Amino acid sequence: MARITVQDAVEKIGNRFNLVLIAARRARQIQINGKDPLVPEKNDKSTVIALREIEQGLIGNQIID
């Protein structure tokens, strides 16, 4: 099971509400639109992949603009 520290992702985005919006949009891009993940998948769900991308600074606020 993947271990994601949400606090690290919140620090990258600024607040938890925007984190939810950004992670959901990125997860949809990966799952429905077929976008390639920017981190190794490791059999994780798209939501976990999105959070890992945010945590590593690969995805940010620009996705909701």
From Swiss-Prot:
Keyword Transcription part of the UniProt annotation: yes
GO biological process: DNA-templated transcription
One cellular-component annotation, GO: DNA-directed RNA polymerase complex
EC number(s) reported in the record: 2.7.7.6
Source domain of life: Bacteria
Catalytic activity: RNA(n) + a ribonucleoside 5'-triphosphate = RNA(n+1) + diphosphate
A GO molecular-function descriptor: DNA binding
InterPro entries: DNA-dir_RNA_pol_omega, Pol_omega/Rpo6/RPB6, RPB6/omega-like_sf
Broadest EC class assigned to this enzyme: transferase
Keyword tags: DNA-directed RNA polymerase, Nucleotidyltransferase, Transcription, Transferase
Keyword Cytoplasm assigned: no
Family: Belongs to the RNA polymerase subunit omega family.
Purpose: Promotes RNA polymerase assembly. Latches the N- and C-terminal regions of the beta' subunit thereby facilitating its interaction with the beta and alpha subunits.
Subunit structure: The RNAP catalytic core consists of 2 alpha, 1 beta, 1 beta' and 1 omega subunit. When a sigma factor is associated with the core the holoenzyme is formed, which can initiate transcription.
Record's protein name: DNA-directed RNA polymerase subunit omega
Source organism of the structure: Baumannia cicadellinicola subsp. Homalodisca coagulata
Lineage: Bacteria, Pseudomonadati, Pseudomonadota, Gammaproteobacteria, Candidatus Palibaumannia
